[in-house]
Design a protein with these regions (language model features):
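Generic detector of well-ordered alpha-helical packing
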Residues: 50, 73, 87-90, 94, ...
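An extended, acidic
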Residues: 143-260
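N-terminal subdomain of lithium-sensitive/metallo-dependent phosphomonoesterases centered on the IMPase/IPPase/PAP
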Residues: 1-88, 255
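DPxDG-like acidic metal-binding loop motif
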Residues: 58, 79-136
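Short loop segments at secondary-structure junctions
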Residues: 108-112, 122, 131-134, 140, ...
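Small-residue (primarily alanine) positions within well-ordered alpha-helices
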Residues: 13, 17-20, 116, 216, ...
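Residue-level signal for inorganic ion chemistry
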Residues: 24, 49, 60, 91, ...
């Protein structure tokens, strides 16, 4: 793929994320009524998720018909040039009226993350990165925090019910014993964007799907952060664990997270 082709996709993805966010806001404000259903405990899906993903898919397929699209709600096939889409990351917040959710769009070429866009409609903040071109929030370059001590760190630790609860609680105990302040804001992609912007010092989750993780991981890397290898041995569709942090605490946090 040429630099011009990649640049065109990056610009398109930024516009698309804003447009998708505007549509999602209509549902969030109940200008369009919707019903939410639980796929599993604390894992919600709503008509808003389906509508926003359909909107994104249609725009991508019209603009780049040869590209593949993999979405949280609609699935899809893999391809050399692949878009990964989470139409509303943080659906549990969205359906409860909590303003911590986002639109996440990533682009992967031959297995390499090349574009990441995360839009927070509630604050009208657009986080974006293209491989090798730094990370940005709107027109401002962003960087991970300079934190170098765990006992000064603010870390987000997400949890998914399919992961053993005992392991999650043991990890939180280790983090607290190390002096870490621990939060879970309920939207992994947006938490990754906030790590890239230096607002949080790190983000951990035992498992993330590619549509949740891809855009944010590129943001963190381009903002000077470090990440644990992703995806796991099962490949892209299977996803894997996520550790993303400021470089000054990454090694210590990785050891703490992977300890048993």
């Amino acid at each position: 793929m040429t630099a011009a082709e990649l640049s065109a996709r990056a610009e398109f993805a930024r516009r698309l994320a804003r447009d998708a966010g505007a549509l999602a806001q209509r549902y969030f404000r109940r200008e369009i009524d919707f019903v939410a259903e639980a796929k599993s405990p604390q894992d919600f899906v709503s008509a808003a998720d389906h509508a926003v993903e359909a909107f994104i898919r249609e725009r991508l397929q019209k603009a780049f018909p040869a590209d593949a699209v993999l979405g949280e709600e609609g699935g899809g096939a893999l391809g050399r040039n692949l878009w990964v889409v989470d139409p509303i990351d943080g659906t549990i917040n969205f359906v409860h009226g909590v303003r911590y959710w986002c639109i996440a769009i990533g682009f992967i070429t031959a297995g390499e993350r090349r574009i990441g866009v995360i839009y927070d409609p509630s604050l009208d903040e657009l986080f974006w990165a293209t491989k090798g071109e730094s990370a940005w929030c709107d027109e401002t370059r962003i960087h991970v925090s300079p934190r170098d001590r765990l006992d000064h760190a603010l870390v987000c630790a997400g949890y998914v019910p399919r992961h053993p609860l005992e392991e999650h609680l043991a990890l939180k105990r280790r983090l607290h014993e190390a002096g870490v302040a621990v939060k879970d804001m309920g939207a992994g992609a947006l938490m990754l964007a906030h790590v890239a912007a230096g607002r949080y010092d790190a983000f951990l989750e035992p498992h993330m799907h590619p549509w949740d993780a891809s855009a944010g991981l590129l943001l963190v890397e381009e903002a000077g952060g470090r990440i644990h290898p992703y995806p796991g041995p099962g490949g892209l569709v299977a996803g894997g664990p996520v550790i993303a942090a400021a470089p000054g605490i990454f090694a210590a946090l990785e050891r703490l997270t992977l300890a048993r």
